[in-house]
Curated annotation (Swiss-Prot):
Protein name in UniProt: Ribonuclease 3
Annotated family: Belongs to the ribonuclease III family.
Gene name in the database record: rnc
PANTHER family for this protein: RIBONUCLEASE 3, RIBONUCLEASE III
Cofactor(s), names only, from the UniProt record: Mg(2+)
One MF term in the entry's GO annotations: metal ion binding
Domain DRBM span(s) in chain numbering: 155-225
Length: 226
């Protein structure tokens, strides 16, 4: 991989790896190699959840568990991580197999989000918990400053359902219209039919649940509630 691209990524992350192989593994999708990033992703997911939970606990001393859980879910969900990955220009650094390259995997939200988590796991193993906590809080500084408790933190499906129920309208229906990929790396496409919208809304995700949430989020935008 181009060392200029890798060095640019490390500058954006604010961290230079001592163990180059950990960085390469974090950037490697399972379609490209048997030494892929899924174990690092597992580790990074847990570390991210802890760091954000700890930050919210101290930032909002009077907020209850439910609101803190919703705020954490907002901050660690896939589209937030994918947004962060795009800020790092992570797509140009991914190591993908031929099939994923051909299908535009370097733009896919689920792959981008998973790679951010893998990088978190890799940085932790390359350094220590204090270093990765400092980095995560730096990456999340503006998002932590902007977030606040309240209904906005409820997941999109819940907000869409409550909106429709409040107007005595039928609940949305979700239909799986396509499933792509192997069992370990699937992509679901969902059509969501909502009263008041003339055509089904489309959502895509790495699981049925994530695709339904993505569709509900698009529906909220079309209903001008986002």
């Amino acid at each position: 991989m181009n060392p200029i691209v890798i060095n640019r990524l490390q500058r954006k992350l604010g961290y230079t790896f001592r163990q180059h192989d950990l960085l390469m593994q974090a950037l490697t999708h399972r379609s490209a190699s048997s030494k892929h990033n899924e174990r690092l992703e597992f580790l990074g997911d847990s570390i991210l959840s802890f760091v954000i939970a700890n930050a919210l606990y101290h930032r909002f001393p009077r907020v209850d568990e439910g609101d803190m859980s919703r705020m954490r879910a907002t901050l660690v969900r896939g589209n937030t991580l994918a947004e962060m990955a795009r800020e790092f220009d992570l797509g140009e650094c991914l190591r993908l197999g031929p099939g994923e390259l051909k299908s535009g995997g370097f733009r896919r939200e689920s792959i981008l989000a998973d790679t951010v988590e893998a990088l978190i796991g890799g940085i932790f193993l390359d350094s220590d918990i204090q270093t990765i906590e400092r980095l995560i809080l730096d990456w999340y500084r503006s998002r932590l400053e902007e977030i606040s408790p309240g209904d906005k933190q409820k997941d999109p499906k819940t907000r869409l359902q409550e909106f429709l129920q409040g107007r005595h309208l039928p609940l949305p229906s979700y239909l799986v219209v396509q499933v792509r990929g192997e069992a370990h790396d699937q992509e679901f496409t969902i059509h969501c039919q909502v009263s008041g919208l003339s055509a089904p809304v489309v959502g895509v995700g790495s699981s049925r649940r994530k695709a339904e949430q993505a569709a509900a989020e698009q529906a909220l935008k079309q209903l001008e509630l986002e």
